[in-house]
């Protein structure tokens, strides 16, 4: 899980979702998981 000021899609499988006011990226590739913080 990477914590970044700006989250971006890293590949076509990445999905940007908002969970409890936190923007997250979920993906089949565990390396691509991110959240904004």
Swiss-Prot record:
Keywords: Ribonucleoprotein, Ribosomal protein
Listed GO CC annotations: cytoplasm; ribonucleoprotein complex; ribosome
Matching SUPFAM superfamilies: Ribosomal protein L36
GO biological-process terms attached to the record: translation
Keyword Ribonucleoprotein: yes
GO MF, any single term: structural constituent of ribosome
Family: Belongs to the bacterial ribosomal protein bL36 family.
Protein name in UniProt: Large ribosomal subunit protein bL36
Gene for this chain: rpmJ
């Amino acid at each position: 899980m990477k914590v970044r000021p700006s989250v971006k899609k890293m590949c076509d499988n990445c999905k940007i979702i908002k969970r409890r006011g936190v923007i997250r990226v979920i993906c089949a590739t565990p390396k691509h998981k991110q959240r904004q913080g």
